[in-house]
Amino acid sequence: KSIFLIIGMFLLLSIVLIGLLSYSSPIYEFNYSGDNNNYMTVGKAMMHGFVPYKDVFEQKGPFVYLLYGLASLISFHTFLGSAIFEIAILFAILWLTFKIGKLFSSTKVAFVIALFAPVFVLMEPYYSYGATVEFFLYPAMLSLIYVSLKAQQHQFIISKWTWYFQGCLVGIVF
């Protein structure tokens, strides 16, 4: 029962923080980030059949463009889709930080530790008012840290599915 309360609080915190701190939020009239506008443009082009690096070019990897392309399907003229993805990413950061904390402490202590995660991932210049590529990669890195620490506690026995999932996350990062 308390885990659902924690999940709800993490989700609410994610919505509030992204709503206030991200230019992708509907409360901002325009997203002033040049990078985010570039990613959205390439993502929209992909959704219309253009081939990245051939028909349109920007220097980031295809995962970023796919993410923004999917965001454009949610809302073509705004960054609402991007804001929804940012909320999901911040929630994942909070949850994974909580899970890491639970490996070494009580639920209450892990919860408090997780509440500090946004302080570090949403600060300038790393967050830069939303949707930086680095921000989207935090869950992949935290997942690897969690799996490594948990494996250490269990004689380094890791399931094939966990290896596969971590491999997919590494593929996204690189």
Per-segment meaning from a language model:
Residues 1-21, 160-161:
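Start-transfer (signal-anchor) and selected internal transmembrane alpha helices
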Residues 20-58, 70-74:
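Extracytoplasmic loop-helix module adjacent to an early transmembrane segment
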Residues 62, 66, 76-92:
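Loop-to-helix entry region of an early transmembrane alpha helix in multi-pass inner-membrane enzymes
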Residues 65, 79, 93, 114-137, ...:
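Aromatic- and kink-enriched transmembrane "portal" helix at the membrane-lumen/periplasm boundary
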Residues 84-104, 143:
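Transmembrane-helix motifs of polytopic, lipid-linked glycan transferases
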Residues 97-120, 138-139, 155-158:
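Transmembrane-helix signature of polytopic, membrane-embedded enzymes
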Residues 142-165:
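Membrane-interface transmembrane helices that cradle and orient dolichyl/undecaprenyl
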Residues 168-174:
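Transmembrane helices and adjacent periplasmic/lumenal helix-loop junctions
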